[in-house]
Amino acid sequence: MRGGGFVQIFKDFSNWSTVAVVPHVANANNKISRIFWIAIFLFVLGMFAYELYILIAKFFSYPATVNTEILFEKQIFPVVTVCNMNPYKYSVVKSNSAFSSVNTLMTTYSDATVGTFSTDKWGLYADNDETYDLDSRAADALVLEANLISDTAKVPALYTYADLIQDCSFAGIPCSESDFTKFIDPVYGACYSFNEDASLNYSVSREGIQFGLKLMLTVTQTKTNGNTDSLPTTKLAGARIGVNSRGSSPGLDSNGIDAGVGYESAVSVSLTQNVRAKKPYGTCVDREPDSSDYYKDFIYTLETCFNGCKQRDTIAKCQCANPRLALGSTDTACQPIKADLDCLQTLKGNQTSSTPNIDLLVECNCNPPCDESTYTPTVSLAQFPSTSYYVATSSTAGVGSCSSTNSKFSSKSDCQKWYNNNGMIIQVFLETLSYELYTETAGYTVSNVINDLGGQAGLWLGLSVISVVEMTGLMLVMGAFCVTGGAIKMAPDDDEIENDHRIKDVEDVKKEIDHLEKKHGEMESGSDGEVDDIENKGDEEKKKK
């Protein structure tokens, strides 16, 4: 009985279902027609299953899309960091006992460059036939030697704000030392960051060079008396410039801009913001795990992650940390000895050999930050000062203006020449107030799946919301039938049909109708006979006459 009940349920469903093909299968007149419609149903069902698989696979691949917006609004001015490429005053290095090892290094390097061969603890003479190798090793040795000197002991040899920055203005308004944050870089010595302090509120609502930061710098490779004050290992005369968002690492050693003496360097910057999607739609992270984060004081960037990875690689291979990069609280810095310098040199790798440098993209497992602001610089140069321009500055603590009252120079032309060899102007400004915002979002959501699923179901099976309701009703009826154990009858049995008064009433009505039709037929037959008798009688009377 239960099997028959299910059959009856499906028969009823096929009669009123809106699902494509199902009514055709149920109401087919012959076997061939039914087989044909079953084949059609299986085909469209298979196509729907294939499309469903594609939709599910696409959803679980978690694709992402990038929305691009061009925004135009008032912007916070970026942090601008300036450092002297010459980290320490050579005059102090030669006279201050705290720098005795650095002074010995400078003397040894100078001897090596002119071919005076001897032995040394840094290995400057060993296997350094190329000038580049000698310069690179001497620069690394200087960083290691300076790392052994405390920040307090370094102060006499560092360039003060007054030594480095002769003049400062922002949008034409003078700025001062209080607008800068000082820090000591392991490579460039004392550096000064403008607008780094969160209490400052330098922002711009107009673009162009007139509404940016203007600095006059003096790197003092020679003093005003003509004595050289630049270390022998300093190759370039100028400043290292960094432009970054507040809270980010300046990245001077890898991402800085070189600005040379005797020029005005105009640095126009444009802002780009990236908002990336987190897992599963993206790979961005907010921070590294604390156990491996060397740059906890800075906003996370790919650069900080790569630097931390390089530091871990250095510690693993050299058993010491490179002072050029951030050190952990328990790390031991490499010593200024040949063995450690040799190890650091090997980590740089020979990119043309089978032992290249560490592959940061493969070996470091660094992911981009979820929220990132970057400034793209464009630099243009012009000679400074011009042949007829005599430098004027409001500063009285530094070298001062090229005026006749300046006792540091014998003439205005000598002052001009000194600035040409030691001075420079830096101008940093926003190229435009518009900036690009890239927002990464989920590219295929549940809503998209439902929309596409509805389209495919309608195309291949003719399904709609009504069809879903019908199939839901079918499931409920089948469930109720199973729960009641077949007690719910899907069709009446023979006894119920025989005793159903409604059916009997219908049969009685049918019999009565048949009887009336028979009587009506007999009456019509009788009427035709009477008409014939009347016609015959009329004919006989005519004959008699």
From Swiss-Prot:
Residues bearing glycans: N201, N350
Motif extent (GAS motif): 462-464
GO molecular function, one term: pH-gated sodium channel activity
Reaction catalyzed: Na(+)(in) = Na(+)(out)
One annotated Gene Ontology cellular component of this protein: plasma membrane
Spans within the Cytoplasmic topological domain: 1-34, 479-545
Keywords assigned: Cell membrane, Disulfide bond, Glycoprotein, Ion channel, Ion transport, Membrane, Sodium, Sodium channel, Sodium transport, Transmembrane, Transmembrane helix, Transport
Predominant place of localization: membrane
Activity regulation statement: Inhibited by the diuretic drug amiloride.
Coiled coil: none
Family matches, as InterPro entries: ENaC, ENaC_CS
SS bond partners: C83-C191, C284-C370, C305-C366, C309-C364, C318-C343, C320-C334
Transmembrane segments: 35-55, 458-478
Protein's cellular compartments: Cell membrane
Biased composition (Basic and acidic residues): 514-523, 534-545
Residues exposed to the Extracellular side: 56-457
Membrane topology: Multi-pass membrane protein
GO terms (BP aspect): sodium ion transmembrane transport
Region (Disordered), start-end ranges: 514-545
Biological function: Could form pH-gated heterotrimeric sodium channels that act as postsynaptic excitatory sensors in the nervous system, generating rapid, transient inward currents that fully desensitize upon extracellular acidification.
Family statement drawn from the similarity comment of this UniProt entry: Belongs to the amiloride-sensitive sodium channel (TC 1.A.6) family.
Subunit structure: Can form homotrimers. Heterotrimer; forms functional heterotrimers producing channel with different properties.
Name of the molecule in the record: Degenerin-like protein asic-2
Gene assigned in the entry: asic-2
